[in-house]
């Protein structure tokens, strides 16, 4: 039988350049050699993808950016002295702002790795190195702690990977979330006009929101940081803008990546003071851009006091000022027949096309009536048609010409932002509009909750990112490896047939077979646990003995859960053997008796003499009054998530944070669609589930609640 290998992946994630790539690669190689000396079955892997060339190229780009700033500064001065037009001066000022921003970002990129402390995980690594630690050696401990412990919830994370599009490993996702949140916090705190106070206010609005808003906290912080990096705003102002982008984007069914792309273009435009084609094209990559374009048109016409606005349209309809011919030219000659059909359905009596035209003339048709027939774009399309004949008004047809003329100034864009915020406030309570969005929000909720649990867990034990040491590395390697075996077997049996036909559906027969295979795999794993293997396990775990007990406890609970799923009451015969005696179990206890409420630190039985041997106790537990160095529950949102992890192999029990047996919402008749949502039974999970249920039910979707 082949010997088991323990694999530690040592990675260096910089999002940019490395200050000394050769040294980093040497560290990886040294770790590998040391591991082989310690345990010939250990295998350390790692690679540096950014070589020294990266820093040289960045330095070269910075020099060019600085040169560009100097040239533009001189050009601007010459333009002002030579009597250039206002448009020419504004264009140069805009280019200068962008060049300065680019130079600042490049300069920050170069300085970040070498000088900044505490910025994301890379900052934590720098901090550890400055304290005398080994760069990659310490980083591998941090990464391996997360990787090893995440193996303990392999069933949880594996079970939801298909459902919520978690494309990368849980440990990497957690660290990415951590880095993003730390970076956003640093940027917001330093760029908001009210600093750290503004950061607290910004996140205070999020914390007061619903569960779905909270689930996007990290992404919203990133949006806020983008806005505050380009323009002077307070925490409250930044949140209003970000909330509007998020609410309008959600209503359009757009994901966070698309919202970030729009925000970047908007921030550049606001920062330069005038809207230019490059920024506008960036914003127009999605439907968000079209929405904001309508706001810009309305704002420009308002400030010039020309044309008609969206606020004035309802009154114009009420007073019968909208002509039937205008509607025909804008929406087609059959507009009246479409409206007649809708009014007949609404009123329950026959309404003719002639009747519709009389209703229009008498002011009996509202904006909502037209929106119901012609969609959300009705208002902007009609206003554009009406304003085409208004002298000096901005329309979709002349938008680019007006943009080149500098019509969309800072004042106009700020007014457009206000209108955008008003639209966002109306939409904020409606929540997601597509199933893909719901999946994304569940995923974000899982990642955000995992990070909150990670930070709380570290704080509870008196640890920080820079103090994870050899104990944790050894514990996570060994415990993670053992747990990973079981998790891999159980989840592997199920995921083989998940979405087999690529249609998002799994038949009952296929699911039943997969569940039985998975249950057998878990059962077989526990049947193989015996004194010999655990004894070797104990010898290797060393100072992490308490984590072994927690593993054993968790394993027993998982075993019990499998037995319950099988509707059997089979117990492990006889006593628990020598390992049970060593850990203080009653002589003839079953696994269920031994682990139901047992914890050796609080038990009267002290098999290892910790209470008598204070030196050994101090060595094992440190100075934290018995608190556990690391807890397997950090990343699973609570003890019950780990204890019931095996539920992930049972699709009709509770999986973790959402599993769907249907394809997307919106392509079928929702009133006849049967959707099942499974959410982990934590408080946050239940709140998220409830909001999703309510949202879907309001839209006529039939649900099976479990």
UniProtKB/Swiss-Prot annotation:
Biological processes annotated in GO: viral tail assembly
Molecular function (Gene Ontology), one example: calcium ion binding
Ranges of residues in domain EF-hand: 271-290, 361-380, 496-521
Chain residues that bind Ca(2+): 499, 501, 503, 505, 510
Keywords associated with the record: Calcium, Coiled coil, Metal-binding, Repeat, Viral release from host cell, Viral tail assembly
Keyword Repeat found: yes
Alphabetized InterPro entries for the sequence: EF-hand-dom_pair, EF_Hand_1_Ca_BS, EF_hand_dom, Tape_meas_N
Residue stretches in coiled coil: 9-113
UniProt cross-references to NCBIfam families, sorted A to Z: tape_meas_nterm
Family: Belongs to the Mulikevirus tape measure protein family.
Protein task: Serves as a base for tail tube protein polymerization and acts as a template for tail length determination.
Protein name per UniProt: Probable tape measure protein
